[in-house]
Design a protein with these regions (language model features):
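N-terminal hydrophobic or amphipathic helices/low-complexity stretches enriched
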Residues: 1-13
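N-terminal capping segment at the start of a domain
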Residues: 10-26, 173-175
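Cofactor-binding active-site loop characterized by glycine-rich and histidine/acidic residues
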Residues: 17-20, 32-162
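Structured core elements
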Residues: 63, 169, 205, 230-232
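Short, active-site-adjacent cap segments at secondary-structure transitions
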Residues: 71, 148-149, 177-178, 237-242
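Short acidic, glycine/serine/threonine-rich loops at helix termini
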Residues: 74-75, 103, 152-154, 180-184, ...
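Thiamine diphosphate
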Residues: 108, 112-115, 120-223
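Glycine/aspartate-rich loop-and-adjacent alpha/beta segment that forms the canonical ThDP
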Residues: 211-284
Length: 284
C-alpha cells in the first residue's frame, strides 16, 4: 500500500474512531487519534497479521499496551476483516465484547491490556518464546508515554536486552499528555533516548503521525543485531482535528453533537485536500 493510500486510511480511521466513541458516549478520544497512524502502518504494511494468519504459529504478535486507546485498535481490526464494522456500534453496550479496553474475546486481540505497564512485559515474554522455539515471528507493542512511570516497564526492558530480543519492537506514543496534564509535570521523562539506550535498546525517533516516515523507519527493522528495537514516535494527542489536538480534556472527553459534526467536517476537508494533492501529482 502506497503512502497516499495509507494517508487516506488514517483519515477514514479517525472518522470511525469519533463515530464509535460518540455512539458509545464513552472512550478515549485523544490517545486513540494520536496512535492511529502507527496502527495503520503496522497493520497495513509491516506486520504479518490477518484473519487468514490468525492461528499461524509464525504470525507476528501485537500487544496494545496503552489499552485505553482501544477504539483505534478496534477500528483497524474491523478494517482488516477480523469482524464486521457494524459490531463496533455495540461499543461499551451491555453484553458486548467490545469493551473499553482490549480483551481476547475480540478476534485479532492477542492480550488483555489496560492496566498500564503490563503490555511490555507480556511482549517480552512472547518475543523470548519465539527465540526459544526457533520461530521467526516478531512482537510489536505500543505504549503511552505516561505509562513509562510504571516500574514494570524498566524491569521488562532489562530482560529484553539481556535476552537479545531483536524480534521485539517497542513503540512509545510520545504525545506528552496524560489524564492529569503534561507528562513532564506528572513524572519527568527527559532524556528518554539515553534512558532506553542505557537499557540496551536500539533507539530511533520518528514523526508518529507521518505514515511515510513510519513506513520508512519500520522497513529498517531490526535496527541493530541482537538489540531490542525502540521507536520514540513523536505524536500529537487528538491528531487530525484542530480543536482536539494537544488538549488534555480530550483524554476521555466524548464529543458533543456540534463537536462531532465539526470534527467530521475537518476530516472530510482533509480528505478532499489529500485527493486534490494526489490528482495534481499524478497529472505532472
Amino acid at each position: 500500500m502506497d503512502n497516499a493510500a495509507l494517508a487516506r486510511k488514517s483519515i477514514a480511521y479517525r472518522k470511525t474512531i469519533l463515530t464509535i466513541i460518540k455512539g458509545a458516549n464513552a472512550g478515549h478520544t485523544g490517545g486513540s487519534l494520536s496512535c492511529t497512524d502507527i496502527l495503520n502502518v503496522l497493520y497495513n504494511q509491516v506486520m504479518n497479521i490477518s484473519p487468514e494468519t490468525a492461528n499461524s504459529p509464525d504470525r507476528d504478535r501485537y500487544v496494545h499496551s496503552k489499552g485505553h486507546s482501544v477504539e483505534a485498535l478496534y477500528t483497524v481490526l474491523a478494517d482488516k476483516g477480523f469482524f464486521a464494522r457494524a459490531e463496533l456500534d455495540t461499543l461499551c453496550k451491555a453484553g458486548s465484547h467490545f469493551v473499553g479496553h482490549p480483551t481476547r474475546k475480540v478476534p485479532g486481540i492477542e492480550q488483555n491490556t489496560g492496566a498500564l505497564g503490563h503490555g511490555l512485559p507480556v511482549a517480552v515474554g512472547m518475543a523470548l518464546a519465539a527465540k526459544k522455539d526457533g520461530r521467526s515471528y516478531r512482537v510489536f507493542t505500543t505504549m503511552g508515554d505516561g505509562e513509562l512511570a510504571e516500574g514494570s516497564i524498566w524491569e521488562a526492558s532489562m530482560s529484553a536486552s539481556h535476552y537479545k530480543l531483536d524480534n521485539l519492537v517497542v513503540i512509545v506514543d510520545r504525545n506528552t499528555l496524560q489524564i492529569t496534564g503534561r507528562t513532564e509535570d506528572v513524572m519527568q521523562l527527559d532524556s528518554l533516548e539515553a534512558r532506553f539506550a542505557a537499557f540496551g535498546y536500539a533507539v530511533r525517533h520518528v514523526d508518529g503521525n507521518d505514515v511515510a516516515a513510519l513506513s520508512d523507519l519500520f522497513a529498517q527493522l531490526p535496527f541493530e543485531p541482537s538489540k531490542p528495537n525502540l521507536v520514540l514516535a513523536h505524536t500529537v494527542k487528538g491528531k487530525g482535528i484542530s480543536f482536539i489536538e494537544d488538549k488534555v480534556k480530550w483524554h476521555h472527553h466524548v464529543p458533543t453533537d456540534q463537536e462531532y459534526a465539526s470534527a467530521i467536517s475537518e476530516l472530510e476537508l482533509s480528505e478532499q485536500q489529500l485527493r486534490g494533492t494526489h490528482v495534481a501529482a499524478a497529472s505532472r
